[in-house]
Amino acid sequence: MKKPINTVAPDAKIGKNVRIWNYAYVGSKTVIGDNVKIGSLAHVDYDVRIGSGTKIEGSAYIPPMSRIGKNVFIGPAAVLTNDPYPPSRRMIGVTIEDGAVIGARAVIKAGVRVGRRAVVAMGSVVTRDVPAGMVVMGVPARVAYTRKEFDVKMKEWESGS
């Protein structure tokens, strides 16, 4: 098997059993925990922290200074931003707490905190903090239901009911 073609800054700290797929980028001073997967064409910029067990799908963008917790899922082409008023000289990352789920093509505004085990539905635009254990969806994203309800729906889907 050929070694994946990607770019990882020499001063990035990469944990054990990390898989970085083809054409992904990991920036300077980024720290990645154990058992993390980063999909093809994903861009993880400089000074990012990613907790163990997190999965970042292809074409996702994680901006500088973002903090991603443990066991987070970030769907394909999700975009976290770092400048609410571009092009500003002041930047701030996004914080995603442990166990959160970010759906495909979701966009999260700079400085937003996504709470523990919260879910951002695919295609949503998040402009405010997301409370822990809640599911948000829409443009702009609003609370739709709880993570507990989401987990029930997922189990029903997986069982084919």
Residue ranges of each PLM-predicted region?
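Short conserved catalytic/interaction loops centered on acidic-Pro-aromatic/His motifs
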Residues: 115-117, 133
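Leucine-rich solenoid repeat scaffolds
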Residues: 125-127
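Flexible, glycine/small-residue-enriched loop-and-beta-strand segment within the central core
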Residues: 1-5, 9-10, 20-114, 139-140, ...
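Conserved beta-strand-loop-alpha-helix hinge in the C-terminal portion
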Residues: 132-156
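ABC ATPase nucleotide-binding domains
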Residues: 158-161
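Binuclear metal-ion centers of metallo-dependent hydrolases, dominated by the metallo-beta-lactamase
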Residues: 120
